[in-house]
Design a protein with these regions (language model features):
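Repeat-solenoid scaffold signature
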Residues: 192-206
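Sec-dependent N-terminal signal peptides
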Residues: 4-15
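Beta-propeller blade signature
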Residues: 105-115, 163-176
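Blade/loop signatures of beta-propeller domains
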Residues: 18-23, 178-189
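Acidic, Gly/Ser/Thr-rich repeat motifs that build Ca2+-stabilized beta-propeller blades
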Residues: 19-158, 206
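Secondary-structure boundary elements
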Residues: 116, 142-148, 173-185
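Short, well-ordered junction/capping motifs at the entry into regular secondary structure
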Residues: 155, 187-193
Length: 206
């Protein structure tokens, strides 16, 4: 039976004359395998479900709206629709993309935010595809107008030590997918891919 996860709002009450804290959990809404979320304003979260849906939830009244999209994702193993980030009316989403039958990539797409339908376009695609259905990553973080993304090693172990391949790395790119000129340069590593910020990781999701 498919597991249903609950989105829970943590409300922290700060007593005015005491250092003690009371915690109260409020059930806001139910989702099917939620994976990523990002605030689009003070009252609404946009949420990905691993199974492929993108939804907006109002945290005040619990109302949920589904948003159509054009992503050709694959819900398989640990893969599916993964993380999502909102900034300046744009959305970035990581997902499991089918490159050819039984071969998958961790890919990242960007689209202009729209409440009814979002048209995404890829800005990153993993360069070493695999038939593995595990360890896709993938957490997205925007900082100082750079997009950081963790790419899982797909169960490949030592592939994460290869600076010419994306699995097992963190990439750092501009918000449009281009590669920053100030990305780190590594001595004695002339073939280190310019978008790779760090190697040697397993399946970072935090």
């Amino acid at each position: 039976m498919q597991k249903i996860f609950l989105l829970i709002l943590l409300v922290i009450l700060f007593p005015s004359i005491s250092l003690s804290e009371d915690f109260r959990f409020l059930k806001i809404a139910s989702f099917s395998k939620p994976w990523g979320s990002s605030f689009i304003n003070n009252n609404e979260l946009i949420i990905t479900e691993k199974t492929g849906k993108i939804k907006i939830v109002n945290i005040n009244n619990g109302k949920i709206f589904e948003v159509e999209h054009n992503l050709k994702f694959e819900n398989i193993g640990q893969g599916g629709l993964l993380d999502i980030v909102f900034k300046n009316n744009y959305l970035w989403v990581s997902y499991t993309e089918v490159i050819k039958p039984f071969n998958y990539s961790t890919s990242i797409a960007r689209g202009v935010f729209n409440r009814k339908k979002i048209k995404f376009k890829n800005i990153f695609q993993q360069n070493s595809i695999s038939g593995s259905t595990q360890h896709f990553g993938s957490r997205l973080v925007i900082q100082d107008n750079y997009l950081f993304a963790s790419i899982g090693e797909r169960g490949g172990g030592m592939i994460a030590q290869n600076s010419k391949l994306h699995p097992g790395s963190i990439i750092r790119i501009h918000l449009d997918g281009s590669i920053p000129k100030d990305n780190p340069k590594f001595i004695n590593e002339p073939n280190w891919l310019k978008e790779i910020y760090q190697i040697g990781l397993r399946n970072p999701q935090g």
